[in-house]
Amino acid sequence: MAKKVLTQIKLQIPAGKATPAPPVGPALGQHGVNIMQFCKEFNERTAKDAGLIIPVVITVYSDRSFTFITKTPPASVLLKKAAGIESGSPKPNKQKVATLKRDVIRKIAEQKMPDLTAATLEAAMRTIEGTAKSMGIVVED
């Protein structure tokens, strides 16, 4: 018989740095999940992505066991890393903070493809370009 799903918890945690401190501890503790076990498994699974923020969906079952799925980092985090900037522009229409080539956008779109609803790579690239534009990053050919 399948386990009964109690809840799903969505968090964004820095790769390899999950600790029982907030936001992880309280979110998992209120559902009776073994926090240290989650932190250990998450840190092992995301050690190679150090420095990135990793979205995670934790499914908690009625017997207090859990499973989790890690997703690709948010597009904004990948764009900031590629452009070498700390944050996007406060006025993206007037003040541009960086310039990226289209091939960099293509690489980010390929990486994000499993988590995007886009049917083609070109559609995924347009999605990433829209995110870049809203952050004040110029995309060149």
Swiss-Prot record:
Domain of life: Bacteria
Modification(s) after translation: One or more lysine residues are methylated.
Keyword Chaperone in annotation: no
GO terms of molecular function: large ribosomal subunit rRNA binding; structural constituent of ribosome
UniProt key word Ribonucleoprotein: yes
Keywords annotated in UniProt: Methylation, Ribonucleoprotein, Ribosomal protein, RNA-binding, rRNA-binding
GO BP: translation
Entry GO CC: cytosolic large ribosomal subunit
Membership in a protein family: Belongs to the universal ribosomal protein uL11 family.
Subunit note: Part of the ribosomal stalk of the 50S ribosomal subunit. Interacts with L10 and the large rRNA to form the base of the stalk. L10 forms an elongated spine to which L12 dimers bind in a sequential fashion forming a multimeric L10(L12)X complex.
Function: Forms part of the ribosomal stalk which helps the ribosome interact with GTP-bound translation factors.
NCBIfam families with a match to the protein in the record: L11_bact (TIGR01632)
Protein's name in the database: Large ribosomal subunit protein uL11
Species this chain originates from: Caldicellulosiruptor saccharolyticus (strain ATCC 43494 / DSM 8903 / Tp8T 6331)
Name of the gene: rplK
